[in-house]
């Protein structure tokens, strides 16, 4: 068994233990040993307090936690036959905030975490991608901050915004504010075209097969070339099973298994505490090894 005591690239520390057989991972176990306890923090609190607490689960993806919280609170009203009517404008502002944060996260993920590690496979000199001093690294940080400025216009602050509320949002951006948001996001699009993909935005959106990856000219092309040079496409392959819950209006919910698409049934999502530490559990149980719960779909 091989163990990585601290798994990086995630929010919060984790421990990874792998069992190998014939140079292939035959079993893996991930332990989250830092107690967060948000479920216990929320006990006894007013329901709306969750809008303040849960975005603080993560300093990167707080919008996702906020959106999930507001959906849960609105679901309560729906279950007592008092559904809240959310306007299309409010829905759109929620989606805009969520997707701006996704764009910000992708820029940071690519330039701060992934690309430097891939380059180190080829050379110790990171050059323009060097953290804190490389010109491209600094450009990426500036671009990410511009997207967050756009989000702050409707969110009031970042991170840990709480502008989504049951029934809608607490912002009503003016035309000037919307123009400012567009300017911030236009700068991100220009960086995307010039530095990330090296092609026109519309041309990139026209890509519909892996063969089109050869048209890339930017940093993504550099990443592509290094990945194939070191056969990274052969690593980490799983079981070709993917799930999207459809929490964004941009994507329909569904399950893909062996290239067949199936309708997603949320009643088949199950949460298990069999291997989870419990505060009220005084009996030492060898099965319990993590503070996280296990989630499965259709067994």
Residue map of PLM features:
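Active-site bordering "gate/hinge" segments
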Residues: 1-299
């Amino acid at each position: 068994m091989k163990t990585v005591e601290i798994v990086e690239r995630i929010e919060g520390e984790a421990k990874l233990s792998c069992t190998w057989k014939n140079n292939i991972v035959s079993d893996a176990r991930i332990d989250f040993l830092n107690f967060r306890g948000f479920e216990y923090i929320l006990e006894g609190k007013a329901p709306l307090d969750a809008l303040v607490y849960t975005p603080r689960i993560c300093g990167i993806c707080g919008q996702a936690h906020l959106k999930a919280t507001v959906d849960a609170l609105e679901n309560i009203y729906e279950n007592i036959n008092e559904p809240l009517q959310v306007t299309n404008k409010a829905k759109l502002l929620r989606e805009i905030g969520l997707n701006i944060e996704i764009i910000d996260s992708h820029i940071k993920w690519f330039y701060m975490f992934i690309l430097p590690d891939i380059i180190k496979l080829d050379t110790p000199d990171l050059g323009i991608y060097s953290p804190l001093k490389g010109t491209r690294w600094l450009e990426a940080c500036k671009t990410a901050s511009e997207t967050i400025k756009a989000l702050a216009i409707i969110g009031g602050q970042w991170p840990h915004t709480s502008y989504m509320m049951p029934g809608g949002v607490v912002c009503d951006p003016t035309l000037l504010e919307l123009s400012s948001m567009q300017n911030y996001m236009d700068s991100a699009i220009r960086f995307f075209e010039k530095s990330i993909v090296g092609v026109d935005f519309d041309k990139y959106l026209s890509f519909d097969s892996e063969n089109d990856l050869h048209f890339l000219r930017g940093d993504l092309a550099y990443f592509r070339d290094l990945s194939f040079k070191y056969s990274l496409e052969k690593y980490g392959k799983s079981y070709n099973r993917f799930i999207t819950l459809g929490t964004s209006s941009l994507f329909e919910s569904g399950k893909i298994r062996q290239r067949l698409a199936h309708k997603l049934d949320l009643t088949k999502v199950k949460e298990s505490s069999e291997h989870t530490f419990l505060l009220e559990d005084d009996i030492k149980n060898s099965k319990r090894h993590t503070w996280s719960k296990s989630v499965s779909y259709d067994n």
